[in-house]
From Swiss-Prot:
It is an enzyme of class 3 (hydrolase). Keywords: Cytoplasm, Hydrolase, Protease, Serine protease. PROSITE patterns: CLP_PROTEASE_HIS. Its main location: cytoplasm. Gene3D superfamilies: 2-enoyl-CoA Hydratase, Chain A, domain 1. GO terms for cellular component: cytoplasm; endopeptidase Clp complex. It comes from Frankia casuarinae (strain DSM 45818 / CECT 9043 / HFP020203 / CcI3). Fourteen ClpP subunits assemble into 2 heptameric rings which stack back to back to give a disk-like structure with a central cavity, resembling the structure of eukaryotic proteasomes. This is ATP-dependent Clp protease proteolytic subunit 1. It holds the Pfam family CLP_protease. GO terms for molecular function: ATP-dependent peptidase activity; ATPase binding; serine-type endopeptidase activity. The gene is clpP1. PANTHER family: ATP-DEPENDENT CLP PROTEASE PROTEOLYTIC SUBUNIT.
């Protein structure tokens, strides 16, 4: 990240910082500096409060300038499908290209969001690990409730497979086979599969939009 002093970006409405990532002063300094450089960071399990913060940040950056790229950095083991789909839909909704960068781990919903970045602008650091599998969830209640939940799980599974096939260029039959169990990829394997477009080792290999003037 550039050492040039970046202005503090106003944070609208509720606190957009991810919980549990240091005290308020640390969060203010780091996350506002990242936002000023059009960087959004997903560094935890995907759940509702995290998704709300990331969606708000994407909308904020789109409103500020709909022509400049947004960079979503991902180090996540996955999480809630509904929370992840809120982020996914917002990525597609904003006018900006959303570039994605994986570091550490992009598993499950983290993998899904990684491959959903703008075509040609999906990156992985060399030692990141990517894992794809089918969505899972508990089923309980009456027989009728179980039938409804099972139907919804099948719908979610098919929908996500179709989206992954779209973003990777893989046949959906291949996605069905490969996501039936946990499948792990190195960064280079993820590139070959179509999850990412580039494996990079240095920050200068990821184009930067720079701070807001």
């Amino acid at each position: 990240m550039s050492n040039i002093a970046a202005p503090r970006l106003p944070v609208p409405g509720p606190d957009l910082r991810a919980p549990g990532q240091g005290g308020p002063a640390f969060d203010d300094q780091v996350f506002n500096r990242l936002l000023a450089n059009r960087i959004v960071f997903l560094g935890s399990v995907v759940e509702d409060s995290i998704a709300n913060a990331i969606c708000a940040q994407l909308l904020l950056l789109n409103a500020e300038d709909p022509t400049r790229d947004i960079f979503l950095y991902i180090n996540s083991p996955g999480g809630s499908v509904s929370a992840g789909m809120a982020i996914y839909d917002t990525m597609q909704f904003v006018e900006n290209d959303v570039a994605t960068v994986s570091l550490g781990l992009a598993a499950s919903m983290g993998q899904f969001l990684l491959c959903a970045g703008a075509s040609g602008k999906r990156y992985s650091l060399p030692h990141a690990r990517i894992m794809m599998h089918q969505p899972s969830g508990g089923i309980g209640g009456t027989a009728s409730d179980i039938a409804i939940q099972a139907e919804q799980m099948l719908y979610t599974k098919r929908m996500m497979q179709e989206r992954i096939a779209f973003h990777t260029g893989q046949p959906i039959e291949q996605i069905e086979r490969d996501s039936d169990r946990d499948r792990w990829f190195t960064a280079e394997e993820a590139k070959d599969y179509g999850f990412v477009d580039h494996v990079v080792q240095q920050a200068r290999q990821v184009p930067s939009e720079g701070p807001v003037s």
